Amino acid sequence: MLKLFLSTPRTLPNSRFLLLRRLQPLGLRYRSDASSLHLFTPTWRDHATNTIIKFVPQQVAYVVERMGRFSRILTPGVAFLAPIIDKIAYIHSLKERALEIPTQSAITLDNVSLGLDGVLYIQVYDPYKASYGVEDADYAISQLAQTTMRSEIGRLTLDHVLRERQSLNIHITDAINKAAESWGIRCLRHEIRDIRPPESVVMAMHQQVSAERQKRAEILESEGKRQAAINVAEGDKQAEILDSEGQKIKTINSALAEAQAIREKASATASGIAVLADSIKKQEHGLEAVSLYIAQQYITNFGKLAKASNSMIVPASTSDVSGMVAQALSIFKQVSKTTAPDKSTPKELHTDEK
């Protein structure tokens, strides 16, 4: 005949009290602290009573000993235990758990003392190793995380610790997994929660940040001035280029216009001379009229030059005006003789050809 193990509820809510009343007729013992206890803890030799029929919750493993030796592991569902000789020695939660790592001090590679704390996420994957491989798993994992964190911090400088927190977490997780493999515990991830450097270092970091911001502001200001100067220089350059292009075009157009005017003037002068020469040839006394015109122009222009105080004519005799006129007429006659066509030349050439 089975012995009923009844427990009197003390601080249970009404729902738990009703559940207790339902379990008592089955001869099962209900523990009020079963759902709130840290099931993944050291030894649980007095927290699971052999009630012959046992309902194992989901994601919970019961380690059963028979006569003091390991017998088996109960998986979720219903299980039957032999009275007296079977005993639930350990209870482990197979869920992921968060284990808080207390604050500790660590010294970086550049001799800066830091205050660190973190959170470690762990999970039992082998209840047998978790039961018999370590005495106090929580304490062992916490101490291992602290020593690993100090070791990893000692390899890095302060700047690397602040900048590479994610890689530091990965290194700590790998180191804990290697050490805790024989405990049946897996470290899923580690998170550094807070890094507290000394006050002097914090003040120096603030000054460095302020200096960096001031430096960036000055650099941006100088870059703005530089860009503005470049833009002004580029504008002046383009203006000079456009102005020179305009002056070039203006000079070319002016030269072309002047050349065209000279050509037109020369053409008009040549036409006038040709008409005048033709008229002189046709007139009976044309050469005498031209000689008279030259003499008049010579005397008139010489008189204008004589009035100018800053003009000098060398050689020239102002007392012998008639001689100068005669000289000018002599030159004209020689030029007219040289330019006059020789009508006998073609005949002589024709005779020579014969």
From Swiss-Prot:
Principal location class: mitochondrion
Q: List the disulfide bonds.
A: none
Q: Name one GO biological process term.
A: mitochondrial membrane organization
Q: According to its UniProt record, where is this protein located?
A: Mitochondrion
The cellular component terms of Gene Ontology attached to this UniProt record, alphabetical and capped at eight, are: mitochondrial inner membrane; mitochondrion
* Domain of life where this protein originates: Eukaryota
UniProt keywords, alphabetically: Mitochondrion
The cross-references to Pfam families, in alphabetical order and at most eight, read: Band_7, Band_7_C
- Answer yes or no on keyword Mitochondrion: yes
CDD domains documented for this protein: SPFH_paraslipin (cd08829)
SMART domains membership: PHB
- Which protein family is named in the record? Belongs to the band 7/mec-2 family.
- State what protein this is by name: Uncharacterized protein C16G5.07c
Q: Which organism is it from?
A: Schizosaccharomyces pombe (strain 972 / ATCC 24843)
